[in-house]
Amino acid sequence: MDMNIGVIKGDGIGPEIVDEAMKVLDQVAKVYGHTISYTQLLMGGASIDVAGVPLTEATLAAAKASDAVLMGSIGGDAKTSPWYQLEPSRRPETGLLQLRKGLNLFANLRPAVLYEELKGACPLKEEIADRGFDLMIMRELTGGLYFGKRSTEEIDGVVTAKDELTYNENEIRRIARRGFDIAMKRRKKVTSVDKANVLDSSRLWRKIVE
């Protein structure tokens, strides 16, 4: 199999960990007879330093043309980095949000597994750690607070910040389906987490999921 992987090393420890990940991929490709080519791309602070923006149209187009994207970390120290002197819409993390939206990466999959050898290092109660766990945590990435309208303004002499939380039924339905599809390959159990006793968005979320 021939594959082209877009590589976004990013900022901070990103280049270091991505370099090691590429070594692993190269060995996997060697063992299984694959050929991997890499396209180096800039995003986040690294892109700001070169192009003045956290994500360029060229980088997004190259990511879309890739078979996969390997990414490190984005951003730096908010107290010391000059990137955080910029307007919020031009800071490193906005590049990540734009990439998620551009690639329609709506489902963030985060496996959590407690291996037998690491039970002693687990911060959970002993009776829980002894049973172990194997979870797949899924988070919606392209709707909700991160993509709603936001503002900070002075109202009646008081500085007030607003973040708008919006979900539509299609956004909820597609991530619910992804969750059920993954569950069918595991233990066939799904837990949907919401705040339906307070939030309209959560009430819609629960209705669609059920």
Give residue spans per PLM region.
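Generic secondary-structure signature for well-ordered alpha-helical cores
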Residues: D26-H34, A65-A68, K101-N108, L114, ...
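N-terminal glycine-rich phosphate/adenylate-binding segment common to multiple enzyme folds
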Residues: D49-A161
